[in-house]
Amino acid sequence: MSVKIDKRAYAEMFGPTVGDRMRLADTELWLEVEKDYTIYGEEVKFGGGKVIRDGMGQGQGVASEVADTVITNALIVDHWGIVKADIGIKGGYISAIGKAGNPDIQPGVEIAIGAGTEVIAGEGMIVTAGGIDTHIHFICPQQIEEALMSGVTTMIGGGTGPATGTFATTCTPGPWHIHRMLQSADAFPMNLGFLGKGNASLPQPLREQVEAGVVGLKLHEDWGTTPAAIDNCLSIAEEMDVQVAIHSDTLNESGFVETTLGAFKGRTIHTFHTEGAGGGHAPDIIRAAGYPNVLPSSTNPTRPFTINTIDEHLDMLMVCHHLDPAIAEDVAFAESRIRRETIAAEDILHDLGAFAMMSSDSQAMGRVGEVVIRTWQTAHKMKVQRGPLPEDSARNDNFRIKRYIAKYTINPALTHGIAHVVGSIEVGKLADLVLWRPAFFGVKPSTILKGGMIAAAVMGDANASIPTPQPVHYRSMFGSYGGALQTSVTFVSQAALQNPEVAALQLKKPLVAVKGTRGVKKADMVHNGWMPEIDVDPETYEVRADGMVLSCEPAEILPLAQRYFLF
């Protein structure tokens, strides 16, 4: 016997369905459910008197026939769609996206539930892929917990701890340091990959770092990003299938932006903080965002442009790059990098899909726990200032939402050759998933899964009689301890998997090789492949893209900010 219920009652019981709209936290962004893979009247839900009970929504299949975990009635927000579905997890990987239940009595079941299945209630929750931050200065290990609690599940960068070189550059230099960092990676519930130092004009110093296990090489101006170093580094990358990231020559000592672009010779490269405040040819490194072989990203301090952005950056830059405020030349160096015109243009270039990625620049002119927040603050600011995108309607901002979520999920995964494992909610990928209450979307996740196991969550008093009493705060869960850390992976080069020195380290976490980094182009950046011709006026710093002036006002107030934080 069937019964009809109204839309509000249905949404409260099973979460939103097709045509329902939802506001993302306190932003002006609205999503609309595009498709519902569950079957009306056959939805599964756990609890007393609910569906997932023996002989009802739970069948008799043995462990090999059923999911290890099912997230029920989840609202998936990913680059490929905004849909309602059950998510099946098996062996730490996403096994199915569709309809869960008991195939013995229910139609259309793609995810079998049995006695061996755990359930996570996704009703009324948003589920996203774990974030990927590709600009990490590994200055302190506490960054990893901070990032995890913000919804980031993969970190790529370089460093060796609070060393002077690491304060300024994302490089783990040389085989000895690389091996020590690989060993350290075993201790953390985070997918990790390390970048070697790419500043060398001969091949062997770079080749040996790739063989030691780095996933890419970083060219940084503080080590000397000369045309010779760029050319040599990209040559090794082409030979060994790893990515190159670059922080180019702010002072234009060894050439101008045209010189650096010429040294690329059409080869793929990831340009960090492509606007320039984080470093790069002054004042026009932003031009690189229009080239087909350049994969441009931002770091989060300039995201979005606010009334405080300029003032904050000057002090931040002096500290991070070991500059002396008593030396006039050092002050001039800092001031040359901070330009309100290019920072404002960066907002718009993100909104139009010319900048493809977002990252942090952790503790080195960036905040490791704010990649997700700053992404959605930028999207909100652009919605308020520029209105709906042409691809959207008055009803929803679905395309804008897909464009922005791609900036910290699938696009960094594609760029660094790890999209076969992470970066989206798709069958066959690692179950790195983040659950959000809609009112807290983008700012405070509820539950973070690593490889199918809960690694972190909001949790109340451990001595309470129920899980919810205050103080409620983020705590590490069982997926963050002991052998369960193997639900995370360590990314390495293909050459490292063949290296007996790496095998001798006896690393505990699975090693996964990066691949396909050299064939990725700007056109492959999902929802973010626009390649305009960008010009910067050398006198006024006015930015134009295909002749259009890119200018916007700084924000005076933002969502996802003080409303959500005591400190």
Swiss-Prot record:
The pathway where this protein functions is: Nitrogen metabolism; urea degradation; CO(2) and NH(3) from urea (urease route): step 1/1
Record's keyword terms, sorted: Cytoplasm, Hydrolase, Metal-binding, Nickel
**Taking every annotated instance into account, which residue ranges of this chain make up the domain Urease?**
130-567
Catalyses: urea + 2 H2O + H(+) = hydrogencarbonate + 2 NH4(+)
Asked if the Swiss-Prot or TrEMBL record annotates the protein with the keyword NADP, the reply is: no
Output the NCBIfam families linked to this UniProt entry: PRK13207.1, urease_alph
**Name under which the protein is recorded:** Urease subunit alpha
- Give the encoding gene's name: ureC
